[in-house]
Amino acid sequence: MLNRYPLWKYLLILLVLAVGLVYSLPNLFPADPAVQISPASGGENLSESQLERVQSALADADIPLKSTERGANSVLLRLDSASDQMRARGVVDGLLDDDHVVAVNLAESTPSWLRDLAASPMTLGLDLRGGVHFLLEVDMDAAVTQRLEVNASAMRETLRSERIRYRNTEIDGRTVSMDFMNAEDRDEAKSLISRDFPDFQYADAEADRGARLSMTLSDQAVDEIQDYAINQNLTTLRNRVNELGVAEPLVQRQGPNRIVVELPGVQDTAAAKRVVGATANLEFRLEARPDTPEQETETLQFRSSPRTAELMRDVIITGDSVSSATRSFDENGRPQVNIDLDGTGGTLMNRATRSNIGRNMAVVFIEHKTNDRTVMKDGKPEVVRDPYTERGIISLATIQSALGNSFRITGLDSPTEAAELSLLLRSGSLAAPIYFVQERTIGPSLGQDNIDRGILSVQIGLLLVVAFMLLRYKAFGLIANVALGVNLVLVIAAMSMLGATLTLPGIAGIVLTLGMAVDANVLIFERIREELRTGLSVQQAIHAGYERAFTSIVDANLTTLLVALILFSIGTGPVKGFAVTLSLGILTSMFTALMVTRAMVNLTVGGKPLKKLWI
Amino acid sequence: MRQFDFMGKRRLAFTTSAVMLLIALVSLAVQQLSLGLDFTGGTLVEVSYHTAPSLDTVRQTLEAAGFQDISVQTFGTADEILIRLQQAFDPNVGQQVTDLLRAGGDQVTLVRAEFVGAQVGEQLRDQSGLGMLVALGVVMLYVAFRFQYKFAVGAIVALIHDVIIVLGAFSLFQIEFDLTVLAAVLAVIGYSLNDTIIVYDRIRENIRLSRIDDMPAIFNDAINQTLSRTLATSGTTILVLLALLVLGGDMIHNFAIALLIGVGVGTFSSIYVASALLLPLKLQRTDLIPAPKENEDAEELP
């Protein structure tokens, strides 16, 4: 019979509806301000006694705790207000040592039965809800020093290949100085080096027992290096934040040497802080031979044992040459990181390993850290940061054969460390170390007034559409409006399930896809009217209307969906967010227009001997 | 039902399109887009109040003093305020802002004033541009596959036409272009494509059904048949957009303008660019229906 659905189709639609309702429900519960404590890289979760100390310290500070939750890898303290949250963070951070990361957070308050179904609310974007704000400072001096170290290493390489003997290199501020046996060696070196490094100002100096060449970076070169460092860090931080899967973040430069990172709403802020602030990098170096002169070697400790090894000062490659890195497990179930090098990195690695088969090569893990001390200055407490660099060998292995573009690193502490190291290598290293200067929650960037007006206008817009459909298509308009409601629930459910972030443009995007959903219904209804005019019976007209409108709807929606998918795969940040909303909207609107309204039409008028349609 | 002779007026429409495109391109070349805080960066001012202020008052005070594109946020606690302005940084801005806010009688101290960089990095800009090009290419392939390559050319030209005119309008009237407007332009692409495909679909159907070869007449029929749908859809969309424009407040205002222009131009271009272009491209019935094969000839033989 015409216009009847088999039972399973009705059941399928009901099932989709039920799932949609459940997963859109969490959005009705507001989030609590909270403080999250999680272990620093590879450490232990907060112990029960530490937690008790935290709780009593909060009670002493007169900060009421709403609840305490212990997760698999973190502890969450829920609080009543944002100002309590700031104070609580200060108290907890002061109490715990460096083994734990303390971060402010907005915790969802989804009831547990919903959370058991893995339902969680949509994150509201920085414009609607605000989020966490990290201010990071880029260590500009370190950027210059790092560049000088690389340059000095290249200079030594040149001198060695030209067989000019040098004694010592020293880096101080923006100056590299090298000692030579005599003035002739120095002059020869100067003419050789100055060809490759035009950015330096060269000066001769006297040294005890020989001659010294001092090379100072020009102001312009220093500016360029610092500019490069901050831009490189911006790119890297953007990559890292995107790798974390944070939708709609904000990463921007602030002032000459700072970077702001803002992350919206309910996120694992502690993890974000660890990854954003991580300065880990790798260096690959050869082990020194017994006869290597002392000034070319450096003694480093292993990370996992007190053993030490004598390594060459010269670095073969650093983590910067890594083009991709993934985490996996070796035969024994220990974590490892698989690394692919870029072209130049691969060539350098191949050249170094080919001529050194049988020697040991070390993988060195470098981390820039700071010690914060509070000192009294002019009667006010002031935090002084002392940066220091930690270098530790994670593996020392014999080179069996020449290495190419891809290989793996073992010897890591934990799967988490392997995952974070691979993420850091993938997203590129920082050109200069960064330090957290400030961490705050930040309010919505749109004023409450603007948000209210925006939401009001969207509601009125929707009401207008609903009224229009009712007026124009009467009973069928009602069906289309019910489908519109279903569509809205489904989009919200899908966005919540995907963990998408809702921003004001996103809301507007949803309204637009609702408009497109209406369009599909309009197409069908107009077609039914047309078929009625050509004299088809009611049931035939309904059937033909859906049938003929089908290709139009599918073609139009699929083309738009293609655009959305491409924007998603290539675009970043806000473009990506918009693409997600649009794709979901298209899929749900096709479902509601083609299946849900059809089911309702079939249920109400399908198969009945009607003479006239209310359309 | 009344029939409009759409195709008869196509010369006038082509001229209108050409003039609009020309104005848009000249304006884009001469005075570019007036890019917003998201793209240009500006100045950040952090102030501390003695008692928590109303953010809307802060915003209004600054707006009244002629600052543009202002975002005001609480920062940590309710009495610490973070202000971002689209204003080239100079050392006095911080003091200027603080003085303005003090004029209201509040106790305000300046914590810091610094420049902030663009939220949209160059990398993002380049990637988005590339994304658009790839998207256009894939759409062209898809339309060529589902319809025919002449349709693909028409659809793409219509899309580019719409985007250039929307951007041109923003440049001409120097309306601020920020990330929200960028989202609107992407939405215009979606909308315009949707509209074009619906008209194309009807044209294809009519060419296959009809017995005449008079393309302008077939096109007119197709456009007239989809006209009520086009008006209903554009009508509802414009209703929503008008609501956003009038009631939505500052942030949605420009978004609504972009889409209103886009929907208008998009509807126009589905008829007069995408469809009318098929005439100079010499679309024929044989492009959609494979030419009769030999076996049909065989039947006619005695």
List PLM regions with ranges:
Chain B
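A structural signal for conserved, well-ordered secondary-structure elements
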Residues: 1-302
